[in-house]
From Swiss-Prot:
Name the record gives this protein: DNA repair protein RecO
InterPro entries: ARFGAP/RecO, DNA_rep/recomb_RecO_N, NA-bd_OB-fold, RecO, RecO_C
Record flagged with keyword Transferase: no
Gene name in the database record: recO
Cellular component annotations (GO), alphabetically ordered: bacterial nucleoid
Source organism phylogeny: Bacteria, Pseudomonadati, Pseudomonadota, Gammaproteobacteria, Enterobacterales
Keywords, alphabetical: DNA damage, DNA recombination, DNA repair
GO biological process terms, semicolon-separated: DNA recombination; double-strand break repair
Function: Involved in DNA repair and RecF pathway recombination.
Similarity remark: Belongs to the RecO family.
Keyword Transport applies: no
């Protein structure tokens, strides 16, 4: 690749004594693997910038599964994700590494990813709000074309107070059954707009994205979730006044 591309590092691991093997999310070519030769060496000027959550301009070469990094320049400082918000960032990175096939472009999803990181860093909304919006954007970019606004059985628009049960590959069908796969019409409308006005719609969004992402993730648990649980367990208990 001759030109520069905007990228983020999803994950990196040591390769040989001085190099790094990087999983990158690029604006125009999707997820790719890149070998950064000598990046861990003492004299490397890449040490500090090849980190998650740092916007980068990158050039690479090669036609195989693993490209060779040629140049990398930070566009700005890393987005400030700290504390519990850091684990939200690690979660979306792991999600992309697990779900996206290499070499498939997702330019709209790249923008959604950047927006998610910006919302997390700003702390204006809860991390859950940012994560649910991103998960729904990811599903849409993967071709998950479920219709949230119409009953899959009758074709009628969903009604706020009615209950609809999700059926994989079919959609939401009006039902009297209320269980893990059931959602109200109001909750479905919030999924369609990716806006969650209260805790009920936010919880419903989490329940749905867990259901919808499960086939993509298989049975292997996400490491970032376990790391977050460990972080929570290590926090001191708040004393009651």
């Amino acid at each position: 690749m001759d030109g520069w591309q905007r990228v983020f590092v999803l994950h990196g691991r040591p390769y040989s004594e001085t190099s790094l093997l990087l999983d990158l999310f690029t604006e125009n070519e999707g997820r790719i693997s890149v070998l950064a030769k000598g990046a861990r060496g003492r004299r490397s000027n890449l040490k500090g910038c090849l980190q998650p959550f740092t916007p980068l301009l990158v050039r690479w070469s090669g036609r195989g599964a693993i490209k060779t990094l040629r140049d990398a320049d930070p566009i700005s400082l890393a987005l400030p994700l700290t504390g519990s918000v850091l684990y939200s960032g690690l979660y979306i990175n792991e999600l992309l590494s697990r779900v996206l096939e290499q070499g498939t472009a997702y330019p709209a999803l790249f923008f959604d990813y950047l927006q998610c990181l910006q919302i997390l860093a700003a702390s204006e909304y809860t991390p859950e709000y940012a994560l649910r919006r991103f998960e729904l954007a990811l599903l849409a970019n993967l071709g998950y074309g479920v219709d949230y606004l119409h009953c899959a059985g009758s074709g009628e628009p969903v009604a706020d107070t009615m209950t609809y049960r999700y059926r994989e590959e079919k959609g939401f069908i009006a039902s009297l059954v209320v269980d893990h796969y059931s959602f109200t019409g109001r909750e479905l409308k919030s999924l369609a707009t990716r806006e969650f006005p209260d805790s009920a719609t936010l919880k419903a969004a989490k329940r749905f994205t867990r259901i919808a992402l499960k086939p993509y993730l298989g049975g292997k648990p996400l490491k970032s979730r376990e790391l977050f649980r460990q972080f929570v367990r290590q926090q001191p208990e708040k004393k009651e006044n």
